[in-house]
């Protein structure tokens, strides 16, 4: 079970990689980010701290840092999700795809698999899809205009605003 969103840009792959590898990069394009502080940077083993507009706080632990992006764990001991940031393309056209693989047990405290799946399809998946679509919109906005997004620029979100 996952959600993902993708943006394609007429920009070099290296430009996308440069942005997502910058310390505190979420401050530029994440519409629900209050602040994104660095604990340890860059490369495998990097850790940053994300505070959402609603005050929720998570550490993000990076691993599998490659020439095509990175993977991260968000949520610390609770392990809320694995998130893949994948950059593809060449020197003229490229894309960023972000996939969220949630640890469903942290969202639903019910062991019944049928109820978990129903809850996933009816509530969690639409909420996470809306969230990641907003993040991709912010990324696209920043890459095209080189101006930071403002809080809730593309609308609010029940979980993070």
Regions found by a protein language model. Name each.
Residues 41-49, 64-73:
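Short, hydrophobic/aromatic-rich segments at coil-to-beta transitions
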Residues 38, 136-161:
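Short, highly charged C-terminal tails/helix-capping segments
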Residues 15-20, 26, 48, 62, ...:
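Hydrophobic pocket/interface hotspot
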Residues 2-4, 55-59, 79-84:
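Short, surface-exposed coil-to-beta transition loops
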Residues 76-134, 150-152:
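Beta-strand/loop substructures that line and gate deep hydrophobic ligand-binding cavities in soluble
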Residues 10-13, 64-67, 86-96, 141-145:
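A short, structured loop/turn motif at beta-sheet edges
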Residues 52-54, 74-76:
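Short acidic, glycine-rich loop/turn motifs
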Residues 1-41, 160-161:
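Hydrophobic ligand-binding cavity/cleft-lining segments
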């Amino acid at each position: 079970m996952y959600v993902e969103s993708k943006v394609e840009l007429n920009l070099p792959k290296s430009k996308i990689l440069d942005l997502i590898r910058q310390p505190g990069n979420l401050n530029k394009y994440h519409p629900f980010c209050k602040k994104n502080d660095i604990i340890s940077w860059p490369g495998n083993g990097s850790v940053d701290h994300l505070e959402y507009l609603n005050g929720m706080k998570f550490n993000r632990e990076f691993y599998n840092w490659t020439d095509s992006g990175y993977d991260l764990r968000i949520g610390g001991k609770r392990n809320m999700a694995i998130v893949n940031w994948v950059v593809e393309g060449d020197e003229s056209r490229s894309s960023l795809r972000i996939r969220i693989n949630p640890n469903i047990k942290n969202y639903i405290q019910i062991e019944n698999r049928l109820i978990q799946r129903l809850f996933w399809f009816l509530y969690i998946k639409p909420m996470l899809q809306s969230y990641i679509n907003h993040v991709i919109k912010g990324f696209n906005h920043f890459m095209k205009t080189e101006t930071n997004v403002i809080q809730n620029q593309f609308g609010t979100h029940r979980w993070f605003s």
